């Protein structure tokens, strides 16, 4: 989480600086709706104008597309990016003026990756349509050597690779043994009251998700 936030903050800053230099909005390709919402909220807190186009806000697409020149960042799912209507009607205008292209969760490009998304493979077609010297950044925290090589091959010749270490002081793994769902819900509620920021709670069932969501809201 800490590493991801550092990367995100850097391309937020880069997008803002590019806009101030007269470039167009930056495009971030992201595979997860929750992640896109989180990034839009984080951008707003940083004073950066951002919006997202995905399957959860279809009624807002036309409004967002009409006002795209007013944005610093546009977050979009790979499936929407490759939809015929979007590619033919919206993408050409964006490609002509895009400040930067960011491919988030770039391991999804590789069919060797654990979370392969076919539409990510088509991002290379978008890169071919971008003006020369348009910055392209691909980020991931889960790529082995084979996946990195595949991503580089998809992005094109001249792609540079920067890799950080795997020992991250900001991450820890703990196991807490609790007897039943009631105790787990109580522990989560107590823990949430002690920490700041955002996070994700993974559950095995929809019922558990609803239970913990209700407790967290209270």
Residue ranges, per PLM feature:
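Acidic/His- and Gly-rich active-site-bordering loop/insert found
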Residues: 23
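Single, functionally critical "micro-switch" positions that shape active/binding sites
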Residues: 30, 76, 217
């Amino acid at each position: 989480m800490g590493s991801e936030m550092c990367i995100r903050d850097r391309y937020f800053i880069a997008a803002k600086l590019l806009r101030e230099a007269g470039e167009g909005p930056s495009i971030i390709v992201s595979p997860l709706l929750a992640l896109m919402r989180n990034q839009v909220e984080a951008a707003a807190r940083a004073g950066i104008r951002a919006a997202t186009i995905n399957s959860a806000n279809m009624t807002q697409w036309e409004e967002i597309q009409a006002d795209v020149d007013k944005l610093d960042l546009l977050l979009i799912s790979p499936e929407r990016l490759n939809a015929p209507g979007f590619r033919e009607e919206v993408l050409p205008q964006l490609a002509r003026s895009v400040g930067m292209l960011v491919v988030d969760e770039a391991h999804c490009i590789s069919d060797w990756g654990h979370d392969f998304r076919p539409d990510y493979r088509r991002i290379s077609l978008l890169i071919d349509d971008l003006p020369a010297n348009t910055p392209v950044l691909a980020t991931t925290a889960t790529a082995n050597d084979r996946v990195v090589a595949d991503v580089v091959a998809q992005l094109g010749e001249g792609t540079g690779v920067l890799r950080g270490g795997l020992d991250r002081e900001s991450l820890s793994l703990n196991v807490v043994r609790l007897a039943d769902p009631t105790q787990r819900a109580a522990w989560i509620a107590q823990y949430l009251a002690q920490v700041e920021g955002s996070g994700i709670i993974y559950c095995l069932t929809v019922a558990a998700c609803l239970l913990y969501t209700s407790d967290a809201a209270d």
